[in-house]
Amino acid sequence: RFQGLHRKIKATKVFLCSRIFEVYMSAQLRPYKAFFPQIGLRVMIDASSVVIGDVRIADDVSVWPLVAIRGDVNYVSIGQRSNIQDGSVLHVTHKSSYKPEGNPLIIGEDVTVGHKVMLHGCTIGNRVLVGMGSILLDGVVVGDDVMIGAGSLVPQNKQLESGYLYFGNPVKQIRPLTEAEREGLKYSANNYVKWKNEYLDQDNQIQP
């Protein structure tokens, strides 16, 4: 009986949160110690995803099915209009004597994180596309306006210069981006904002 009541209370909290913040989600927002995810406006978090601890999600972000974002031993920050696609894993590096600040995970604005990407304690600039299945390790810094090809491995502490296409295992700089490709980075982010809004509108229509 008490378990059933607890589920009803949790569902009510989620319903109120979705009404106020226009968030499409279930009770997959979880605390870690004193930290609870901070969610911006018009955010979509799929019900099958998990967001834990010190995670700061800005306005118009979309988190698609089966994503795990774990801000437990450091923080995760995701900038406006970025999208985290299906099956991706986002985590951080703890603080230690070796590196007192650890490695948070910082994602800029208008970033597209493709399906099944792994991001661990790295920093990503604005208008970046991380191709499907890519892995970015601790201490990686990616500049603005960068494309990373599918299946790439970006080794620990590597820096990717702004304005280039990178690809490979380990990743290598291939060539400068064309103007069309630069525009495509913004197009991708805007498309995911549009699709996210369609999901939110659909969810609002079925709310009692």
Residue ranges with predicted function:
Residues 11-14, 22-23:
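Acidic, Ala/Val/Gly-enriched low-complexity intrinsically disordered segments
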Residues 65-67:
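N-terminal beta-strand/beta-hairpin edge segment
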Residues 26-63:
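N-terminal segments that cap or nucleate solenoid repeat domains
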Residues 21, 26-39, 72, 78-107, ...:
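Glycine-rich hexapeptide-repeat left-handed beta-helix
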Residues 112:
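Short proline/glycine- and basic residue-enriched helix-capping loop/turn segments at helix->loop/beta transitions
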